[in-house]
From Swiss-Prot:
Its EC number is 1.1.1.300. Keywords: Lipid metabolism, Membrane, NADP, Oxidoreductase, Sensory transduction, Transmembrane, Transmembrane helix, Vision. The keyword Transferase does not apply. This is Retinol dehydrogenase 8. It comes from Homo sapiens (Human). The gene is RDH8. Detected in photoreceptor outer segments in the retina (at protein level). It is a multi-pass membrane protein. The lineage of its organism: Eukaryota, Metazoa, Chordata, Craniata, Vertebrata.
Length: 311
């Protein structure tokens, strides 16, 4: 007798990774999943519904969910038949730029969505998972949760917070047969990333000194665009990594999705002092930009695999 489909609640499904993941799970050939695809603004649901096709209303339903609102979370969960078996914390927002030009309100918004939004959802589904002694919490983190990136101070901090919180929680939840998986993409070529880079390239960043603005506009932004061109993944590859994690009988705590990006994260892991990563990145960006360009060209030459192999 076939097992009942698992209910998967996904936040942030209006575009990008969340949308692609919801559609792929809903079209699972074995029909292992009943997907609740959520977004803050239901006015943006048309793209998701069109991509879902015949799965809409069958293995996929669309619901409103604002991860920054207790009331919205409670309302969403009350409309789900049964319990949430798999929670995918995908909703997120970015913030890039010189620190002096960023408001505290903007920084708090990032943490409210990226960190506290994820915590709010976990608190809501955890009692049911503990009672049933089973469940899987998947968190879409980032390689920026492993290493800081220049001019991404606040975004990286929100991802570092996720990594520490969920690694700590994983120890307790293993006793309840509940697994936590932190999925850590590198650069992903999505509408989210494209809009963010376009917006910051036009921003004024008041209160920032001219030298820092020069570094941001003339060094960081061109290097960031080249990084996306060289090692950026498409959402489908990242989604496949997430699907592999969800379908695993023994889900990993961490899963990086981009093999081409791994040399950059290795710089931090091989040196416990942290100096190797900071000094190498500083040297490449500020002193040897030609060497940085050469390295990015090497990563993009096509001799390294980019797709995630099923496990």
């Amino acid at each position: 007798m076939a097992a009942a489909p698992r209910t998967v609640l996904i936040s942030g499904c209006s575009s990008g990774i969340g949308l692609e993941l919801a559609v792929q799970l809903a079209h699972d050939p074995k029909k292992r999943y009943q997907v609740v695809a959520t977004m803050r603004d239901l006015g943006k649901k048309e793209t998701l519904e069109a991509a879902a096709g015949e799965a809409l209303g069958q293995t996929l339903t669309v619901a409103q969910l604002d991860v920054c609102s207790d009331e919205s979370v409670a309302q969403c969960l009350s409309c789900i038949q049964g319990e949430v078996d798999v929670l995918v914390n995908n909703a997120g927002m970015g913030l890039v730029g010189p620190l002096e030009g960023l408001s505290l309100a903007a920084m708090q918004n990032v943490f409210d969505t990226n960190f506290f939004g994820a915590v709010r959802l976990v608190k809501a589904v955890l009692p049911g998972m503990k009672r049933r002694r089973q469940g899987h919490i998947v968190v879409i983190s980032s390689v920026m949760g492993l290493q800081g990136v220049i001019f991404n101070d606040v975004y990286a901090a929100s991802k570092f917070a996720l990594e520490g919180f969920f690694e700590s929680l994983a120890i307790q939840l293993l006793q309840f047969n509940i697994f936590i998986s932190l999925v850590e993409p590198g650069p992903v070529v999505t509408e989210f990333e494209g809009k963010l880079l376009a917006q910051v390239s036009m921003a004024e960043f008041p209160g920032t000194d001219p030298e820092t603005l020069h570094y941001f506009r003339d060094l960081y932004l061109p290097a960031s665009r080249k990084l996306f061109c060289s090692v950026g993944q498409n959402p489908q590859d990242v989604v496949q990594a997430i699907v592999n994690v969800i379908s695993s009988t023994r889900p990993p705590l961490r899963r990086q999705t981009n093999i081409r990006y791994s040399p950059l994260t290795t710089l931090k892991t091989v040196d416990s002092s942290g100096s190797l990563y900071v000094r190498t990145t500083h040297r490449l960006l500020f002193r040897c930009p030609r060497l940085l360009n050469l390295g990015l060209q090497c990563l993009s030459c096509g001799c390294l695999p980019t797709r995630v192999r099923p496990r």
